[in-house]
Regions:
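Short, basic/aromatic beta-hairpin or loop at an interaction surface
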Residues: 50-67, 107
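Long, compositionally biased intrinsically disordered regions
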Residues: 31-33, 38-41, 47-49, 142
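Short alpha-helix capping/helix-loop boundary micro-motifs
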Residues: 67-73
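Short beta-strand-centered aromatic/proline hotspots
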Residues: 90-100
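Hydrophobic beta-strand signal
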Residues: 84-85, 130
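Glycine- and charge-enriched low-complexity intrinsically disordered segments
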Residues: 2-27, 39-41, 102, 106-143
Length: 143
């Protein structure tokens, strides 16, 4: 998000369709150059947490926790710095996107205090997920 250019936007909502329960310290994801991605209703994307914060194109992200896959209930724009909630809990803020699985899905990288998995957060299929407009990454992690 660029506060000098961007106004308000809708909340992007979805539901978990599959929970993942593992973590890795050598994943090798690469941060895409784009800080925002347009998404469509019905798309499924993977949610991945990391404690790494280096928001530059090509940054390598190794320490990750896999939360699961979300099906989006509406289209919209997901920006770096957006708050990610699952149920009533703030999981973290969007760091960016890894496109290694395109055209199948994006890995949406979420900055969190630690790389948590779906098991760690006791997630379940159908848990509500939301991406709410943040403050352009000024806050690395929502507490």
């Amino acid at each position: 998000m660029n506060p000098a250019e961007d106004g308000a936007k809708r909340v992007v909502r979805g539901a978990l369709v599959k929970v993942l329960v593992h973590r890795r310290t050598d994943r090798g994801m690469r941060l895409e150059e784009h800080a925002a991605r347009c998404v469509r209703r019905g798309e499924v994307h993977e949610l991945v947490t990391t404690d790494q914060w280096e928001p530059r194109p090509g940054a390598r992200v190794d320490r990750v926790g896999f939360l699961g896959f979300v099906e989006l209930e509406c289209g919209g724009v997901i920006d770096r710095g957006d708050l990610v909630r699952i149920g009533d809990a703030v999981v973290g803020t969007v760091l960016g996107f890894d496109a290694c699985h395109l055209p199948n899905h994006y890995n949406i990288l979420i900055h969190a205090e630690r790389p948590a998995s779906g098991l760690d957060l006791e997630l379940r299929p159908e848990d509500a997920v939301s991406f709410t407009q943040g403050r352009a990454g000024r806050e690395r992690t929502a507490h």
